[in-house]
């Protein structure tokens, strides 16, 4: 029978998929068969996926990406039982339906039928998300009698409250936590002082992962979608990753000095600031976002085409544009190959799953 392990979090976009990728890769290298699924789907590639494929199976987009990245066969991808969406939530609420349905028993039977390996199941975004579907983290842990690893962003010592609340709810099923998105310069202090203190509270710390601009980055295509922007050039470069945001509102000399200190930027500036726009194109700029009235000069378009930097034109003012972009950082799915590769490396370098594997009676991972 396959061992089931739940990967959960106290809040959305905590880094669960990154940990799944890293842990699954490590298990695979040890010859352990890995299955992966999300009982409650949260991301679909298109609306038609909500009705299922492969004979009615609903496969979450995150599950598809992880499967493709790890080279998992179709029978190693576990279908979702329900789709988290306003429409399905409304229907269940009106029907006063808060049970997981017969699919949950089918999931248990499916896992029991697998002779060996590990089934990694990614829970919804928070401890309570999924209650309406009978598929919250606590319900899954109890219903499947499965241990839980929590991935939790660590800002400061106040971050412990959410973990203590999770421990109170999950009890002995909480097998360990991974502290994620830690300020890089704070990692040594956390390992030396904070981790021992957390473990004295009964929480096993399996890793301390530094914050990564790459993993928080967003594609130009995603920014264009969120901003409802007009793409003026370089549509074939919308897969570029934006790690930082710069606002071109200063004089051109100050702007050039500022731009030189940044990397992989999205630069937001007024459509009438051609001097700033041209300066930005000469820096580490992934896209140039023009706000306000007016069209860019032909000189700018030609230079952007030459340097293969997408130009976006938006109807929003600069403040609104900046707010939309800042909201996007760290709130996008891990669906790019370069991010997946980096996530695996982060987990390998900053996590030690040996205590967890001992608890699960699996072979220890060689260092």
Q: Residue ranges of each PLM-predicted region?
A:
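Structural motif
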Residues: 4-5, 33-35, 64, 75, ...
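N-terminal phosphate/diphosphate-binding loop that engages ATP/GTP or pyrophosphate donors
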Residues: 5-10, 14, 18-102, 106, ...
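Fold-independent oxyanion-binding glycine-rich loops
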Residues: 9-10, 23, 39-40, 80-81, ...
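Ligand-binding beta-strand-loop-alpha-helix segment within the catalytic cores
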Residues: 82-85, 91-99, 196-216
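Phosphate-binding/switch loop-helix module in NTP-utilizing enzymes
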Residues: 91-133, 138-143
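Flexible, charged surface loops at secondary-structure boundaries
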Residues: 112-115, 256-265, 280-284
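Conserved catalytic-core segment of NTP-binding enzymes
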Residues: 123-203, 272-335
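Non-catalytic interface/targeting segments
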Residues: 208-269, 328-367
């Amino acid at each position: 029978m396959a061992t089931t392990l739940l990967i959960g979090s106290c809040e959305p976009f905590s880094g669960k998929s990154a940990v799944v990728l890293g842990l699954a890769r490590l298990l695979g290298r040890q010859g352990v068969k890995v299955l992966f699924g999300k009982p409650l789907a949260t991301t679909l590639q298109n609306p038609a996926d909500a009705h299922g494929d492969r004979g009615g199976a609903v496969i979450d987009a995150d599950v598809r990406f992880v499967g493709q990245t790890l080279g998992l066969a179709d029978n190693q991808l576990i279908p979702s039982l329900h789709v988290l969406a306003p429409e399905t939530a409304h229907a269940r609420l009106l029907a006063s339906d808060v049970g997981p349905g017969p699919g949950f028993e089918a999931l248990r039977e499916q896992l029991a039928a697998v002779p060996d390996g590990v089934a990694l199941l990614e829970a919804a975004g928070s401890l309570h998300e999924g209650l309406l579907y009978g598929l919250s983290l606590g319900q899954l842990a109890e219903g499947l009698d499965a241990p839980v690893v929590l991935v939790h962003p660590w800002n400061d010592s106040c971050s412990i409250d959410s973990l203590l609340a999770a421990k109170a709810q999950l009890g002995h099923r909480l097998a360990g936590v991974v502290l994620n998105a830690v300020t890089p310069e704070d990692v040594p202090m956390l390992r030396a002082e904070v981790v021992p203190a957390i473990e004295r509270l009964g929480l096993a710390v399996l890793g301390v992962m530094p914050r990564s601009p790459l993993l928080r980055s967003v594609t130009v295509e995603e920014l264009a979608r969120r901003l409802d922007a007009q793409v003026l050039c370089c549509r074939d470069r919308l897969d570029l990753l934006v790690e930082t945001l710069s606002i071109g509102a200063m004089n051109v000399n100050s702007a050039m000095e500022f731009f030189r200190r940044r990397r992989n930027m999205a630069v937001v500036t007024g459509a009438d600031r051609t001097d700033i726009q041209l300066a930005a194109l000469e820096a580490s700029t992934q896209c140039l976002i023009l706000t306000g009235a007016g069209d860019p000069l032909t000189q700018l378009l030609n230079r952007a085409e030459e340097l293969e930097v997408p130009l976006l034109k938006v109807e929003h003012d600069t403040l609104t544009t900046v707010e939309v972009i800042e909201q996007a950082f760290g709130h996008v799915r891990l669906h790019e190959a370069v991010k997946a590769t980096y996530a695996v490396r982060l987990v390998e370098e900053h996590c030690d799953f040996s205590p967890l594997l001992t608890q699960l009676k699996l072979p220890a991972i060689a260092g």
